UniProtKB/Swiss-Prot annotation:
GO terms for biological process: serine transport; threonine transport. It is a multi-pass membrane protein. This is Serine/threonine transporter SstT. Coiled coil: none annotated. It is found in: Cell inner membrane. It comes from Salmonella heidelberg (strain SL476). It comes from the Bacteria. Its main location: membrane. It catalyses: L-serine(in) + Na(+)(in) = L-serine(out) + Na(+)(out); L-threonine(in) + Na(+)(in) = L-threonine(out) + Na(+)(out). Belongs to the dicarboxylate/amino acid:cation symporter (DAACS) (TC 2.A.23) family.
């Protein structure tokens, strides 16, 4: 009987809301650090194990997901989504650029167990580009062992294109391997509440409760930047497309898509909601049936903001100098990283080390930044998903309405 009860409890924990569990871990970590400093320092091992598991799985995750995605790409499907695709990419880059501006206007710092002396900063854009090029030609095994994400991406893309010519059995094997790695990531993420409990406890015990204010500032910068993109940048892009007041459409998408996505924290889970909203807006079915799932995959403005803000927070903490060309390059890299963050639990956080590589930040420190992301993830991930998913339907609606108006004007002229 006791075994059945224990099994039932474990099942409820495994199937329970990860957001609520992380919130509980966060609160318990704060309480333990407040009650007993020695005990809080002792449970820091849980956080260390969690970060170690993330470090172990992240390089393999990037390799398998990108390789499987390219190898299993379907050819021959004709769609009229070029304007939407352009808006997706432009919106993601604009979000990354806004995050760079926000991060320099309101610089955030983190509590990391390293100093600037541990870092050899790049002297400028030329050295950054040279480092990127050298990383691209790294041995694949060496890239995996040293978490060289640029090299991993190059090999994943190359192998993915090569495997397009392979037989279906090989493609299925690659896809199954990708699913297996994704399962391992989900398994690691399920331990996030325990890891966050250990990280928060040990961090507060060693640095004091003032750390929370540092995270509060980081959250304000992150969420403030997302609000800026949702309420200013995206409306500007929509106005450029439809040439009229964009806010009725913007607020409709935030209300009927963003709110759902905020609580589900999954762009994929929000696809049916976006489809229903597109139907309600009388959009072209052939267009939105393709653009909405595509948007859930590559339209990642929120992820671009998260990657940029947290990377620059690490840069500011370590005192690494950043010139304007390097900051612009970070916007491009963050946009590309964001497009690869879909379908992965905590995907945007796990791609932060790739952006950190640009500034010579070691993987150990980059994973501490990822851990900070998980600590604030209760709000960060919800806001990020709400921005991502609502933007999918917003840009789809803007492109469809612009095309309808163009056809109507052409009909009137003829």
């Amino acid at each position: 009987m006791a075994t059945q009860r224990a099994s039932g409890l474990l099942q409820r924990l495994a199937q329970g809301s990860l957001v609520k569990q992380i919130l509980v871990g966060l609160v318990l970590g704060i309480l333990l650090a407040w009650i007993s400093k020695p005990a809080a320092e002792a449970v820091g091992l849980l956080g260390t194990l969690f970060v170690g598991a993330l470090k172990a799985v992240a390089p393999v995750l990037v390799l398998m997901l990108v390789m499987a995605s390219i190898a299993n790409h379907q050819h021959g499907q004709k769609t009229n989504i070029r304007p939407i695709l352009f808006l997706y990419l432009l919106g993601t880059f604009s979000a990354a650029l806004a995050a760079v501006v926000f991060s320099f206007a309101f610089p955030s710092t983190l509590h990391l167990s390293s100093s600037a002396q541990d870092i050899v900063p790049p002297s400028g854009i030329v050295e950054v580009l040279r480092g990127l090029l050298m990383s691209m030609v790294s041995n694949p095994i060496d890239a995996l062992l040293n978490a060289n994400y640029i090299g991993i991406l190059v090999w994943a893309v190359g192998l993915g294109f090569a495997l397009r010519h392979g037989n279906e059995t090989t493609k299925n094997l690659v896809n199954d391997m990708s699913n297996a790695v994704t399962f391992m990531v989900k398994l690691v993420i399920r331990f996030a509440p325990v890891g966050i409990f250990g990280l928060v406890s040990s961090t507060l015990a060693t640095t004091g409760f003032s750390t929370l204010w540092g995270y509060a500032h980081l959250l304000v910068v992150l969420i403030g930047c997302m609000l800026l993109v949702a309420l200013m940048v995206n409306p500007l892009l929509v106005f450029w497309k439809i040439r009229r007041n964009p806010y009725p459409l913007v607020f409709a998408c935030l209300r009927e898509s963003g709110v759902y996505a905020f609580f589900t924290r999954s762009s994929a889970a929000n696809i049916p909601v976006n489809m229903a909203l597109c139907e309600k807006l009388n959009l072209d079915r052939d267009t939105y049936s393709v653009s909405i799932p595509l948007g859930a995959t590559i339209n990642m403005a929120g992820a671009a903001i998260t990657i940029t803000v947290l990377t620059l927070a690490a840069v500011h903490t370590l005192g690494v100098p950043v010139d304007l060309p390097t900051a612009l390059l970070l916007s491009v890299v963050a946009s590309l990283c964001a497009c690869g963050a879909s379908g992965v639990a905590g995907g945007s956080l796990l791609l932060i080390p790739l952006a950190c590589n640009m500034f010579g930040i070691p993987n150990d420190i980059a994973m501490q930044v990822v851990a900070v992301g998980f600590i604030i993830g209760v709000l960060q991930d919800s806001c990020e998903t709400a921005l991502n998913s609502s933007t999918d339907v917003l840009f789809t609606a803007a492109a469809c309405q612009a095309e309808d108006e163009r056809l109507a004007n052409n009909a009137l002229r003829s």
